[in-house]
C-alpha cells in the first residue's frame, strides 16, 4: 500500500482501538506507527496489541513500527481526607513529607528529592497548570506556598515544578520494568518521558542494550535548554507539547517547536510533533479549524511525523481522526508553498561521502524525470540521510533487515521494503526496479535512482549512485558486473 503523502502518522492505541479490525482499519486509513502507552494498561494488554500489530504486518506484507512510551517519573500529590479541597487565591498552603491524608491547609508530596532543590519564589503547578502556587519558604520536610491561581485540587493530581531541575533519573522503577518488557517484546522505538539531560538518555540506552531505538520526549524547560546534547544522545525526538505547555508560557511553544523540528532535520533524526493535535475529535467527528491549522503547521515546518493520542486511543472516532490527519497531510504536501518552505530550510551539511551521495540523489531527481530514489540500507543511515533532503520524488528504502525497515517507518517519506541479501550492485539495481514497479512508484519505461554501499551489508559504506532504467532488459546492458 503506497501512501500519498510523506509525513508519517503515529496513532496511539487504547480502549477505543484494541481489536484486530480497528487497528487494521487505522493502518489502512493512514497510520504508519502505533504507539503503546505504558502509563495505561497491563503488560498483558500491551502484549495483546503488539501481537495484533505483528499479525497485521504479516497479513498486509508491510513493515509497521511500534513505539512504546514509558510513563516517566510523573510527580503527584497525595490524597485528601474528603477527596478534594478548594484553594483560594492568596491563601497559604503546605506541601510536606507527612504520609497521611491532606486537608485544606496541607497535602503529602511523596517526592523527597524536590525538597532539596526547590527554592523560594519558584512555582508549583497542579493539575496541568490549572492551579498555581508560589513557594514562600522551604525546609527539609515542608514547602510553604501562597496560592496565585486557585481551584479544586483532588487526590493524586499531577504536579509540575517548571523552574526546578529534579535530581532524579528519568526512569522510575516501573519504567525499568516496562523497558525490559517492551524490549523483550521487540518494539522498534522507546520513548522516554520527562527527559531533563543527555545522561537520562544514556541510562536508558544502557538498559536497552541495542534492542531498540531511543526517542526522547521534550516536555520540560530543562530539556529545551539542554536540547543539543539530548538530540546528540537520542535516535529521535518527540515534541510533547502537553507538559511542555504547562511548564512554559504557551506563547513560547510555537517557536520552540519550529527550532526543534529544524534541528532534528539537520542531523537526520526523526521528530514527532505531538499532543492535542485533533483533540476535539475525541468527541466530535470533525476537528476545529484551529486544530487543522496546528497539524498543517507541523507539516509545513518539516516534521517527520504527527501524532494522535486520546483521539485514537480513547476517542469515539479513532478511524475518522486518522483519515482526517491523512487528508490534511495530502492537502498540505500538494500546496506549492509547502515545497518552497521545505526547500528553503534544507540543511547544507555535507561532511561525508554518504551526505554527498544523498544530496546528489536529490539534485538529480530535481533535474531529471526519475520517479523514485531507491536506497539500499543496512543500518538505516542512508535512508535517513535521503529523508533529510526531503526530495520531490518518493523514497524507497530497501533493506534485508526487518528491524531496520520497521524503524524507518517513522522517517519522512520512507517507503520501506524488505529485500533479500544482495552481494552485487547489479542485483541491487534489479531489486530496486522490481520494488518500484511492484509498489506503483514507476512503470517499465521510467528511470530510478539507486544508491548503495560496497561492500554490501556493511553499515556506513554508502558510496555508489546510479540512474537506472526500470526495464530489467536495459539494466546494465552489456555490463558484466
Language-model regions: role of each:
Residues 1-481:
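Non-catalytic helical/linker scaffolds that mediate oligomerization, partner binding
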